[in-house]
């Protein structure tokens, strides 16, 4: 029965760039300023036409009919009000603008939208992720062969020993995959392997000056105690071999 491992190579990751959509003039919603400007423009045109009509009627019909005298005063007033509305709508709300100004504004708008950056879409995963105007950094994972297992380190941790070479009963010896060699724990230059090092002061002192039998016996006992204290424990006591 084959075991399938979910590795990153099994899921291809596709990255492609998406150009941001530039809304056209028709897609932009009409604002309140545009509505007010359009109202003033058409009102000014209408009042201007009415003012011109009244002015012409007053100057033409004034000689024959006296009822058109008021048109000489009302016509110029309506004409001036209509021209004022038209100027306000053109200057303040920019209802009537030249083609060159319109092209310049569209170029500025396009440059502002382009400076925001492109959109990147990541597919090949559970849910596609889209980044708008973000900086994409490519991440190359390390090879799997160089990763060490999360378990115990391969280096051996030596247990804590007391001066007599005994393992403390309170702490347990760390389990290792393979126990170390005996000479790595107790090298040959240890004081326990050198026979003359434990009691050499006492032997040298006996040759230099005469001493009594009690001093020699005491020195011999101390040498034996030190030898027992510094003697290494058996290998089977430290690391029990698996059975």
Curated annotation (Swiss-Prot):
InterPro entries found in the cross-reference section: TMEM174
Keyword Cell membrane: yes
Keyword Endoplasmic reticulum: yes
Pfam families the record matches: TMEM174
Transmembrane segment boundaries: 40-60, 73-93
Alphabetical keyword list: Cell membrane, Endoplasmic reticulum, Membrane, Transmembrane, Transmembrane helix
GO cellular component: apical plasma membrane; endoplasmic reticulum membrane
Superkingdom, natural source: Eukaryota
Main location: endoplasmic reticulum
GO biological process: phosphate ion homeostasis
Topology term for the membrane: Multi-pass membrane protein
Disordered as annotated region, ranges: 205-229
Subcellular location: Endoplasmic reticulum membrane; Apical cell membrane
Quaternary structure and interacting proteins, as annotated: Interacts with SLC34A1; regulates SLC34A1 internalization by PTH and FGF23.
Function: Regulator of plasma phosphate homeostasis. Decreases serum inorganic phosphate (Pi) uptake by regulating the sodium-phosphate cotransporter SLC34A1 trafficking by PTH and FGF23 in the kidney.
Protein name: Transmembrane protein 174
Organism: Rattus norvegicus
Taxonomic placement: Eukaryota, Metazoa, Chordata, Craniata, Vertebrata
């Amino acid at each position: 029965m084959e075991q399938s491992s979910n590795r990153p190579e099994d899921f291809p990751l596709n990255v492609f760039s998406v150009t941001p959509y530039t809304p056209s003039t028709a897609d932009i919603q009409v604002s309140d300023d545009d509505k007010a400007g359009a109202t003033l423009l058409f009102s000014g045109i209408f009042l201007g036409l009415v003012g011109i009509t009244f002015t012409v009627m007053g100057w033409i019909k004034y000689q024959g009919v006296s009822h058109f005298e008021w048109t000489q005063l009302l016509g110029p007033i309506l004409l001036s009000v209509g021209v004022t509305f038209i100027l306000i709508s053109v200057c303040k709300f920019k209802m009537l603008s030249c083609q060159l100004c319109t092209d310049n504004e569209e170029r500025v708008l396009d440059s502002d939208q382009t400076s925001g950056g492109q959109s990147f879409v990541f597919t090949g995963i559970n849910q596609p992720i889209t980044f708008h105007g973000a900086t994409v950094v490519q991440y190359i994972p390390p090879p799997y062969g160089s990763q060490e297992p999360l378990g115990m380190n391969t280096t051996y941790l030596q247990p804590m020993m007391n001066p007599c070479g005994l393992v403390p009963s309170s702490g347990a010896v760390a389990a290792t995959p393979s126990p170390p060699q005996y000479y790595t724990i107790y090298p040959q230059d240890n004081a326990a392997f050198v026979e003359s090092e434990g009691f050499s002061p006492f032997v040298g002192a006996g040759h230099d000056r005469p001493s009594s039998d009690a001093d020699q016996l005491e020195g011999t006992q101390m040498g034996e105690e030190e030898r027992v204290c510094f003697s290494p424990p058996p290998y089977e006591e430290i690391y029990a071999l698996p059975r």
